[in-house]
Amino acid sequence: MTMTTTNYGADQIQVLEGLEPVRKRPGMYIGSTGPKGLHHLVYEVVDNAIDEALAGYCTHIEIDINADGSVTVVDNGRGIPTDIHPTTGRSALETVLTVLHAGGKFGGGGYKVSGGLHGVGVSVVNALSEWVEVKVWRQGKEHFQRFERGNPIGTLEATPNEGHSTGTQVSFLPDTQIFKDGIEFDYHTLASRLKELAYLNAGVRITFGDRRADSLKEEQFYYEGGIREYVTYMTTDKTPLHEEIIYTSGEKNDVQVEVALQWCVDAYSDTLLGFANNIRTIDGGTHLEGLKAVLTRTLNSVARKRNKLKDGDSNLGGENIREGLTGVISVKVPDPEFEGQTKTKLGNTEVRGIVDTLVGEALTEFLEFNPGVADAIIEKAVQAFKAAEAARRARELVRRKSVLESSTLPGKLADCSSKDPSESEIFIVEGDSAGGCFSGDTLVALTDGRSVSFEQLVEEEKQGKQNFCYTIRHDGSIGVEKIINARKTKTNAKVIKVTLDNGESIICTPDHKFMLRDGSYKCAMDLTLDDSLMPLHRKISTTEDSGITIDGYEMVWSPRSDSWLFTHLVADWYNRWQGIYIAEEKQHCHHKDFNKRNNNPDNLIRLSPEKHLALHRKHISKTLHRPDVVEKCRRIHQSPEFRRKMSARMQSPETRAILSKQAQAQWQNETYKLTMMESWRSFYDSNEDYRQQNAEQLNRAQQEYWAQAENRTAQAERVRQHFAQNPGLRQQYSENAVKQWNNPELLKWRQKKTKEQWTPEFREKRREALAQTYYRKTLAALKQVEIENGYLDISAYDSYRISTKDKSLLRFDRFCERYFENDENLAREAVLNYNHRIVNIEAVSETIDVYDIEVPHTHNFALASGVFVHNSAKQGRDRRFQAILPLRGKILNIEKTDDAKIYKNTEIQALITALGLGIKGDDFDISSLRYHRVVIMTDADVDGAHIRTLLLTFFYRYQRDLVDQGYIYIACPPLYKLERGKNHFYCYSDRELQEQISQFPPNANYTIQRFKGLGEMMPQQLWDTTMNPESRTMKRVHIEDAAEADRIFTVLMGDRVAPRREFIETYGTKLDLTDLDI
């Protein structure tokens, strides 16, 4: 340290402006009023103590977080001057604390170099604190003064200081009126910065204590070796190329330069930390530019002197030479010029030349005296150069391939429509289910009666044709939905072949999801022979079937009701839901093209019966009503033979039976039955005479029934036998009733509660829920019996039902009676159509191009092979500004590889191409970034955490500017959905789940759904919880402690196992992403 010879007094405190603006616009001075700005207050006070250390007057700084949340900073420097300031007429201490930009650096007398400035930072701290107390030990006295919200309380007090020590103590409590998010300091955030300062100022001891009741800890940071020890700390878990750290320090034109360097064998990127006046310059600056230039020039010069590079060889690039380098450069500049208010880039042009000169001389000398180290560094740089050339060739190959495919973006990127990077965001997700799907010749079942391949769908979409598919709606019923965005998603994809129990085969990617019978999804590669798949069944109507009155129309099986529905009625519902038209009573559905198999919603219109019949009459004049056809029919109907046949037919028992059956079938038709019931109800409600007559008739009937002695006797006998078989029951009932209901208030309360609970709606919902439970369990068991026996063996089912003792499995006759109106054929049909099964899954050796479509709202569709599959390509996003990039599996661990292998990796190729960036040197241009929010969105499991770490490693090592400039985010999807009654809550941690449950009554009923992966969420859930900017939670990634971040990436992603195991065992169980300040 260099000590100044001038005195440090009040006349060296220069006043520039007042303090009033600080409280009005605190963000201009400390960056924000959040956690970052709060901790900046501490840094400003500590920087003042560091200034004393830089000037050579301070060796020990003590920082304490006090029990009341305030902070105290003590140094053993000279102490803030206390004599009267010539300009303000107040003490220098009061001037320093109350006047903005009153500091010891201005005017040049107090400090030779300075980061934080006495009076510049501390006055801001004073303005933004509820109170500040300052003690100064100087000139044999202890001086004290208190300030509140920037205003002095009283005058400077002085008492004798027997010890004649010197120094300054500043205590402050941040103002909650300014820091509305809280004033709690984070120990680790402060410790990280203080440790960094101790490395940068060799020989200065920094003591940091936390005196809060729940913490009580203390650390000391003292590094005699300064930045040399800093480099040693960062390379602890790496393998050094040379044991001795290359170190130099020097001074020129009052600029002090200190550099420490070490190359490592097992690192493929560089970590260079730059500091100017103890301030981390994350955006670089002239000092780092000078260091990089001198490293490149010096190493190339040494390489040629030692014949490592021949005359015809090109120079090694700066990236080649710096591969594997860990270094720290710290400069102390008398008049620093920082670009931007955050002081993150040094702008002094003279510093570049000074660094170049001082480091060049020292580095050349070191390498000349250590030829083995020189050779090792150059050899690693040469290998890096060769790898870069291989990477360049691989990169060019990727570019040429993209040009040949007429696309510069990866095929599986589901891009957004916006071209404005500032509003665009990309979600990097797991799995190919968001990209590749089916072979191009796979057929999709369409509602126009066709089965069309994915390739044909792409072509028809280009031609402007709108197609519609079958889908399972959110309530489990069959529906139709439009198809959009038919496209090829990936080339040369690995696929598997799935064979169904109906003999159909499907070629798809291994992780594409199939819909199970219960509405959930499962990846193709995970399907088993026991899985029950959601089926698609279609048939053509015939009047020979019970209740069917029209021939030749398509019908589709609805899994929710286990019944056949006319497809045109399902499409009609879609039109009404979309508001295409409003359904009115007694309207008819009409196929525009007169093709009753084309059930596309846009082929349907609704007409009044009169218009519909008129349209058909108009059309029929060209078919059945041609004159020749009419005349032929007339002659037939008038013939005696025809009349005899019709008469005989009407009188035959078979015809009478048919007519009777048709009449009964009408009453099995739910629509007909509902119409008749509504008609009767309308008649009943509007006919008071009939209601009175009906009531009298019912009353007369029950009187007549109970007037007969045998009826009264029979009922009395039933009651008598019941109590005879249970002798103690009468007394027990009596006693219980007396105990329970002798309190009138209790009786009144119970009556009220019962009335509230057992509403008609509640009774109906309870009945439906029980009915569905019995229905689903019985149907599934019957289907299993059919599969195991090859046919529906009722006796086998009864044996199974009895053996399980499951009361919810109904007898087959009861099942038919309750749900199928005693029609066994209908029940057997429901069992037959219940599901599909897998019979085989096998790998396919060749790779193929794969395709996908997008299905809005429901995100599933039916294949012509008879099963429903998931459309997961772009669920739950806003296509205007949100893009999705799926990555298959875990990307390459770049911590263990070189550039050539990185560029050959398919997933990294897709990533860097989608972002619009290269990864190093001239290739990397941050201005070309296509999205200003790059969001890592992985599952909440071990694999998801690993993939997230691999991606963060890649960005940190190879696209560091994305991290430094705040473009990288981590999505925080919920872990649980908690449902109670009609309300639901999303919980993002176990703690949040337990807190929510604790708010329920002790006997509350609730259900918990654990989201193991994003694929388990419905699209709307994913949007509401994770992707909607209005409601989501995302963590922005930034680096506070660069050295610690570098070390952690090395530990977690490097080759050495022992440090990684120790780290995971120490911290693994403590990590909660939702609490993590990333």
UniProtKB/Swiss-Prot annotation:
Record field: catalytic activity: ATP-dependent breakage, passage and rejoining of double-stranded DNA
This protein's UniProt keywords: ATP-binding, Cytoplasm, DNA-binding, Isomerase, Magnesium, Metal-binding, Nucleotide-binding, Topoisomerase
Xref: Gene3D superfamilies: 3.30.230.10, 3.40.50.670, Hedgehog/Intein (Hint) domain, Histidine kinase-like ATPase, C-terminal domain
Chief location category: cytoplasm
Residues annotated to bind Mg(2+) 2: 939, 941
Disulfide cysteine pairs (residue numbers): none
Gene Ontology molecular-function annotations: ATP binding; DNA binding; DNA negative supercoiling activity; metal ion binding
Residues involved in Mg(2+) 1 binding: 895, 939
Cofactor-binding details, from the entry: Binds two Mg(2+) per subunit.
Cofactor: Mg(2+)
Protein purpose: A type II topoisomerase that negatively supercoils closed circular double-stranded (ds) DNA in an ATP-dependent manner to modulate DNA topology and maintain chromosomes in an underwound state. Negative supercoiling favors strand separation, and DNA replication, transcription, recombination and repair, all of which involve strand separation. Also able to catalyze the interconversion of other topological isomers of dsDNA rings, including catenanes and knotted rings. Type II topoisomerases break and join 2 DNA strands simultaneously in an ATP-dependent manner.
Family classification: Belongs to the type II topoisomerase GyrB family.
Oligomer status and interactors: Heterotetramer, composed of two GyrA and two GyrB chains. In the heterotetramer, GyrA contains the active site tyrosine that forms a transient covalent intermediate with DNA, while GyrB binds cofactors and catalyzes ATP hydrolysis.
Matches recorded under NCBIfam families: gyrB, intein_Cterm, intein_Nterm
Protein's name according to its UniProt entry: DNA gyrase subunit B
Lineage of the organism: Bacteria, Bacillati, Cyanobacteriota, Cyanophyceae, Synechococcales
